[in-house]
């Protein structure tokens, strides 16, 4: 495994990488493998062709670099790939990683998923910061279990939400108005749902999420009826002041954590 974050690198995983919001800055905080807080400067990696010289690498993280494209990726056996906080707008080139199982590209203003549909083994996908209106590349990803998306509408999300393989869903800055909880194909399979700064106008259908054990709701305004939570097997609910009181009043037996 190789972990590059800004101008530093390790062969063990950092405890916490840079924040996705670091895309527009030149220095950022992260936590190294030993637990030390470190300030890193943006790295100058712009090309990934050297990965061809490391055929045995299966885990590669190149966070907080100067990548504007993945077109330089060589065909290789990387399975876990993290390109968070770079300057990417397209995933074109990602198809060179046919064994890819997990892709994290948070903090990139990605608008184009071209090539991702050829990575048929992807189980985990995180695109917090992306603004993609065409999610058709996700149709072929029949093994997708864990997805994070941002700046989508409920209608645009129908392709991933209709996947029967999904178990974990995180949505950030999405417009979910219009019967969101009825938009899933197999809501019973969802174990974790996180909604951050999303627009939501109804909780109708929430009672069908009978496998849900973890719920996070932050930055979601409006008067919403959370009474369905009382019948779900939830273990933990995290909410901010906007919804915490209404959730606590739902009768849920879950531990309700109030976030800032």
Predicted features by range, described:
Residues 2-11, 20, 24-28, 35-46, ...:
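Concave beta-strand-loop units of leucine-rich repeat
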Residues 251:
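Extracellular interaction modules
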